[in-house]
């Protein structure tokens, strides 16, 4: 921890913000104090989360410890468990986080990394209906980092990604592609 805060102190006035990402940051013991210390240094904080801890999410937002939240929507509710490798996954915490963020308590975005083996056309409409009215939604092109639990995963072409975005825009007009050239 000292290393992190030393780094941030040296860069005050140079950097504007810090992105706290994971794994899942909200699972960490002491995350609130960590965020408080970053805030004391004057940084804005973006939190990347999968939405599994809605109560902690609400707490850090209401305490003013985060300025922006980016939440992963792994897939449609029907295929969420398959996508994360846990069949019959209980989505109730994810659902609570979605509802909370949609209340506009903090600027936020939802995002989905689109993987050909997990996402079909019907999933995009289902996700869109689920997060309808959201501030921002990003469909991100999957990139194989070579360090995946499951090998052989592929991305869609630019054309298919654009078609998916069009489906979603009916429900979430501010839908944008990321990582697609």
Predicted regions mapped to residue ranges:
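Conserved AdoMet/S-adenosylmethionine-binding subsite of the radical SAM
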Residues: 2-17, 26-161
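Active-site beta-strand/loop signature of hydrolases that rely on acidic residues for catalysis
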Residues: 23
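A C-terminal junction/extension of Radical SAM enzymes
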Residues: 162-181
């Amino acid at each position: 921890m000292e290393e992190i805060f030393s780094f941030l102190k040296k860069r005050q006035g140079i950097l504007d913000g810090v992105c706290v990402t994971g794994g899942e940051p909200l699972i960490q013991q002491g995350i609130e104090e960590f965020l408080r210390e970053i805030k004391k240094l004057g940084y804005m904080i973006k939190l990347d989360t999968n939405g599994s801890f809605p109560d902690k999410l609400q707490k850090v937002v209401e305490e003013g410890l985060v300025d922006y939240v980016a939440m992963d929507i792994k897939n449609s509710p029907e295929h969420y468990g398959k996508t994360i490798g846990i069949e019959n996954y209980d989505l109730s915490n994810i659902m609570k986080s979605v509802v909370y963020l949609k209340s506009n308590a903090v600027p936020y975005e939802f995002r989905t990394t689109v993987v050909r083996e997990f996402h079909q056309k019907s999933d995009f409409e289902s996700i869109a209906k689920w997060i309808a009215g959201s501030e921002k939604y990003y469909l991100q092109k999957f990139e194989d980092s070579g360090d995946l639990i499951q090998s052989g995963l592929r991305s869609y072409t630019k054309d298919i990604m654009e078609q998916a975005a069009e489906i979603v825009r009916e429900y979430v007009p501010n839908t944008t592609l990321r990582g697609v050239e």
